Amino acid sequence: MRLRIAILLGIMLLAGGVSAQQQPVYSQYMMNPFLINPAIAGYQGYTDFNLIGREQWLGYSEGPSTYALSGQTRILRTSYRNRSRVIRSRSRRRRPSGRVGVGGLIYTDNNGAMSRTGFQGTYAYHIYARDIQYSAGISLSAFQFKANVSGDDLYDGRDPSLDGIRPGYSPDANVGFLVSGDFFYAGLSATNLFQNAIQFGGGTAETAYRLLRHYNVIAGYKYQERRSDYGFEPSIMLAFTERLSWTLDINFKAYYKEDYWAGISYRTAGAVVTMFGMNYQNFYFGYAFDYGFGDIPTIAKLGSHEIMIGMRLGDSARRYRWLNRF
């Protein structure tokens, strides 16, 4: 009986590579790329707090869901409230060399019979060369994998061999790199560096599953004519595992006065995402809807909803002139 459960859990964890959702899935990562790349921490200069909630397969009670709370900033010796005054008084001075960003993330990802809850702390370092910023970041994390099974789901509840199914606790690490300028960015990140073996039941070989390393490549270009209220941002994200299973997102976003935006994304995994959002003072809001199509389970065509709320403090437009950095 334990072997039967091991086989079922293994299919849930590993089948389909990227699509197996060993990692949380987000649609609005373009608004908060810190979710997928630790090098993002502090790269734009402002302080950002972000809350995101995602419900997949609307109408199905056991559909996947993801919730995440993140924060990231640049470490400075002056508070964000005083930066504009410092910038105005010393704007002609050359920017210093050292840059440090920090961040944190708490998340829970429920994938039906499996759930993953964890947190991470991030350190990033940024340097400049000829108006190009080079960033590197590392996140140290801890997470818990848990099997959400009951007697009615998988087995005869009287079977004592299943009493050993228990959560597994594991440390892990992520790394990321980013190159960015005034109008472009490109980055690479890797997660599950430790490739932890998640164990269920008695912890034998038949109930152990090793997590795959996941890689994300992002790139985008921001275009806006001078004195124009409109801007555009095409971008891509390539996600793949060490087994070379992959999916590609092709994205396009349009802005109006930096206060309103809308976008569309095509995923080769079989989904089209529409999204829109707005900024109001220090706050921003975003919504995305995923519609599945093609050779995917019928249940996945019910669609997914994702809501994002965030707050940004500070002035990112003048980040290159900030002084008194660490």
Give the positions of each predicted feature.
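Sec-dependent N-terminal signal peptides
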Residues: 4-14
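Subset of outer-membrane beta-barrel
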Residues: 21-326
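Sec/Tat signal peptide C-region and signal peptidase I cleavage site
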Residues: 16-20
